[in-house]
Amino acid sequence: PIDEKELIENVDLLFHCAANVRFDLTLKEATNFNLYGTHRVLKLAEKMQKLQVFVHVSTAYCHCTEQELEERYYPASENPFGVMEMVKHLSDDTLKLITPKLLNGMPNTYAYTKGLTEDLVHSYHTKFPIAIARPSIVVASWKEPLPGFVEGMNGPTGLIIGAAKG
């Protein structure tokens, strides 16, 4: 197994593709997966001695309120660090009450937290080079890098499996 020391000393290209893509998560759940998870990877990247670039895989839908999505940085409607602190300290009931106002037109907590995550990643651009990719769709892998690497029936995967089964 690779340990943190080996990563810090040897990684020069880091792809961060992990996220919870469920659309029905509470704000706390989506924040814990998408924001805190990315923040932990960014903190590790900060220590990497040979890092040339940090590539964050986002989604084309994290700025779905825009008429046209350009290849540029979009500031989030809220400070991602502030949202992380708020989620840590507020009760689930309070968060449930304020979530619709925070989403501010976003369709779900996934899109909202992915937009915040882009802002979080951007906040590290003075520490190391970053790139943000916004694919419109992500599907499960069949064999590579190993079977089951991407699990779940989210997005088009369920549709494809359903169509294949008839």
Describe each model-derived feature in a short phrase.
Residues 2-5, 20, 44, 121:
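Short, flexible, glycine/charge-rich loop motifs used to bind or transfer phosphoryl groups or to couple energy/partner
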Residues 1-2, 96-97, 118:
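A generic local structural motif
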Residues 13-17, 24-32, 36-112, 123, ...:
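Conserved Rossmann-fold NAD(P)-dependent oxidoreductase catalytic core, especially the SDR/UDP-sugar
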Residues 12-19, 161-165:
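Amphipathic, well-packed alpha-helical segments that form the structural scaffold of globular domains
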Residues 146-166:
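C-terminal beta-strand-loop-alpha-helix "lid" module of Rossmann-like NAD(P)-dependent dehydrogenases
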Residues 1-13:
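Conserved Rossmann-fold cofactor-binding substructure of NAD(P)-dependent oxidoreductases
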